[in-house]
Amino acid sequence: MAVAVGRPSNEELRNLSLSGHVGFDSLPDQLVNKSTSQGFCFNILCVGETGIGKSTLMDTLFNTKFESDPATHNEPGVRLKARSYELQESNVRLKLTIVDTVGFGDQINKDDSYKPIVEYIDAQFEAYLQEELKIKRSLFNYHDTRIHACLYFIAPTGHSLKSLDLVTTKKLDSKVNIIPIIAKADTIAKNELHKFKSKIMSELVSNGVQIYQFPTDEETVAEINATMSVHLPFAVVGSTEEVKIGNKMAKARQYPWGVVQVENENHCDFVKLREMLIRVNMEDLREQTHTRHYELYRRCKLEEMGFKDTDPDSKPFSLQETYEAKRNEFLGELQKKEEEMRQMFVMRVKEKEAELKEAEKELHEKFDLLKRTHQEEKKKVEDKKKELEEEVNNFQKKKAAVQLLQSQAQQSGAQQTKKDKDKKNSPWLCTE
């Protein structure tokens, strides 16, 4: 049986040349084919005040008309509404989810406006973490709802960021890739727009807000990303209406004083935003979400559960050691709880026994009292019975005596009557 032996990390690997074709040069093609068959997902969070143009910009970015309900300024609080769509361009399928912050900035008290947004982002991280922690995972078919990009719409005031913007971006920068954009940029003069951009970036830096940094470490995108980064925040204009300009139709906004073309880089930064968000850095946004923001959330959650990479002496911990340590800790807590429950049970039993003994004592006392009362009542009844029996006997004796006297009287009366009768019938009495 072959045993794999780990190489030291500092040992250099030898470069070998192949004597013939093997076939692993098709790995990029395999990866492309697999990714194409699986499709991709991309989730955008649009944060901005009601009526600032979030829905219009999404329609313009993806060159389609998404469902959207007209929002009012009467929302009692901020709520997030997510809608998913299946898009296809050539043979590439994209599952796009757009999350809108309905009612953001409409309340008088805006202190907690950021909380529903943070809770939503954390909820998506938690759902993915729970799927990862399952024994039988199914990440292949899992619909990833983690937010990959946050387009933060800044009102075109021309002065500075609102306190709500600073607070919200500061709360979100460790959880999502923030791309600040100035909405309705056609309402600001060009010279004021440059000052406004500089002011926004200065305030973000001074308040420690970390926005998404376009990657410059890859040669293929380094130059374009470095060039585009200086234009942040992007000043955009959105429109789905087409206006005839010269001999062709173009997406634009028609004003009495002229036309603002959406895809004209001299008019706004819409094309730059589309290039950076979709055509150049979409995969990097997805990767940053997983490797940076989600990993931070995952690490914090696992540390809350007691899992760490190092022990108190900063020595590396393996997952098995962490598991055993937590298992022993939980077993110790379980035994402690069992002992506490046992002692509590014994105490409850003793208390119940004392209550039962007290109740038994009270019952015995009541029984003895009832028994004595019964005996006393019985004695009274027996005494009364004896008195009645004596009275009956006396009565019977008197009755017998009376009857005897009556009988004697009757007998003596009968004898006297007979004597008188005999006297009358006697012959001697007649001679006389």
Curated annotation (Swiss-Prot):
Checking InterPro entries in the record gives: G_SEPTIN_dom (IPR030379), P-loop_NTPase (IPR027417), Septin (IPR016491)
Q: Where is this region: G3 motif?
A: 100-103
Superkingdom, taxonomy of origin = Eukaryota
Region: G4 motif, residue numbers: 183-186
The segment annotated G1 motif runs over: 48-55
The record's subcellular locations are: Cytoplasm, Cytoskeleton; Synapse; Cell projection, Dendritic spine; Cell projection, Axon
The PTM N-acetylalanine maps to A2
Query: What SUPFAM superfamilies does the record point to?
Result: P-loop containing nucleoside triphosphate hydrolases
Phosphoserine modification sites?
S9
Its Gene Ontology molecular function terms?
GTP binding
Q: Where does GTP bind?
A: 48-55, 103, 184-192, 238, 253
Extent of Low complexity compositional bias: 403-416
Can you give the residue ranges of the Septin-type G domain? 38-304
Sorted alphabetically, the Gene Ontology BP terms of this entry are: cell division
State the PROSITE patterns in the record.
G_SEPTIN
**Coiled-coil regions listed:** 320-413
- Chain positions covered by the region annotation Disordered: 403-432
* Keywords of the record: Acetylation, Cell cycle, Cell division, Cell projection, Coiled coil, Cytoplasm, Cytoskeleton, GTP-binding, Nucleotide-binding, Phosphoprotein, Synapse
Q: Name one GO cellular component term.
A: septin complex
Q: How does it assemble?
A: Septins polymerize into heterooligomeric protein complexes that form filaments, and can associate with cellular membranes, actin filaments and microtubules. Forms homooligomers. GTPase activity is required for filament formation. Interacts with SEPTIN7, SEPTIN9 and SEPTIN12.
Q: Which PANTHER family match?
A: SEPTIN
The family classification in the record reads: Belongs to the TRAFAC class TrmE-Era-EngA-EngB-Septin-like GTPase superfamily. Septin GTPase family.
Q: What is this protein's function?
A: Filament-forming cytoskeletal GTPase. May play a role in cytokinesis (Potential). May play a role in the cytoarchitecture of neurons, including dendritic arborization and dendritic spines, and in GABAergic synaptic connectivity.
Protein name listed in UniProt? Septin-11
